[in-house]
């Protein structure tokens, strides 16, 4: 997925997290991850803890979809 688009979505969700509970859904070709604690990114990848408290690290090209919703 486009790196700038992913970063913009993460920024919006992390800002909203200060006001309302936020849930991220991150989709890859084979998996779907749920995150409730915010996502972190740099120029190469995105990191987060999923709903099983496993640390997940994904390259931008592995992400096929990302969305934000209320818990």
Identify what each model region corresponds to.
Residues 1-29, 66-70:
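Short glycine-rich, low-complexity segments
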Residues 16-59:
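Acidic, low-complexity, intrinsically disordered interaction modules
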Residues 39, 58-71:
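Structured surface patches comprising rigid loops and adjacent beta-strands/short helices at the edges
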């Amino acid at each position: 997925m486009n790196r700038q688009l992913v970063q913009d979505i993460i920024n919006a969700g992390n800002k909203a997290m200060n006001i309302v509970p936020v849930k991220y859904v991150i989709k890859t070709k084979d998996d779907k991850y749920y995150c409730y604690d915010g996502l972190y990114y740099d120029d190469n990848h995105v990191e987060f803890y999923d709903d099983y408290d496993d640390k997940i690290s994904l390259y931008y090209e592995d992400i096929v979809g990302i969305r934000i919703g209320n818990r």
